[in-house]
Amino acid sequence: MKRVSDYQFNFRFYRFGLIIVLVIGVHSISGYAQPDMTLKNTLPESGKLVNDNPTGKGWTNLLSSAEEWNFENAFWQLNNNTLRGTINREKEHHYSYTKKSYSDFELVVLIKMVGDEDANSGVCVRINPTSWDDAPGYQVDMGKGYWGSLWEERKAGMVQKYPDSLAMKVAKKNDWNHYYIIAKGHHIQAWLNGVKTIDIVHGTGYAEGRIGFQLCHMHNPTIVEIKSLYVREMK
């Protein structure tokens, strides 16, 4: 027959074990790896562009036809393999996104955002739009306080923050910026101009969705241009 002290010991051991399980469970849902804080260029060969074209086989140009996209003509135009978005003191967000959904993939893009200090945009991955101004899912973000960070619209909010003090040394204001993004399972990685700014396993996010871009409402006009947008799906 067990003594009362035995039951107390077992209960404490059980409680301790439960805490360990919960901690492990939390890390499995949202496991943070370390993005690059050294500002070194660690861009993989697969993410490089040569004459604005990706290297290797299997890449698909996502800007070859407007027929492959959903967007409002009042805010977005696609011509000559360049997608251009313009917003001027509008109250809503305005998204453009592919008609096709993607799950596991590599993505490379050149993107330029021109606006004031508050200008904001983002490369959207695995989004599931409900309207032109609502698109739950991930954004590889752009803008002061957000460059190089991973945001999840309508869900977790800031998933992984890249220090603004470093991001402002990497990002090119009012100029072309290169993003390379890998989404495989719940593991999301991204490089901004060759520097790895996102590396996280986020188990609660969407595993599939559209690829797109955001025009964020601001007090002053913002122009976003996208070119050399290629995707390579993973099997």
Please tell me what each predicted stretch does:
Residues G17-H27:
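Bacterial N-terminal signal peptides
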Residues F11-Y14, V26, V140:
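Residue-level micro-sites within transmembrane alpha helices that shape
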Residues G31-K235:
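Carbohydrate-interacting regions of secretory-pathway proteins
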Residues N10-G17, A33, W76:
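Compositionally biased, low-structure terminal segments
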Residues M1-F13:
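N-terminal secretory signal peptides that target proteins for export/translocation
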Residues S5, S28-S30:
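Serine residues within intrinsically disordered or low-complexity segments
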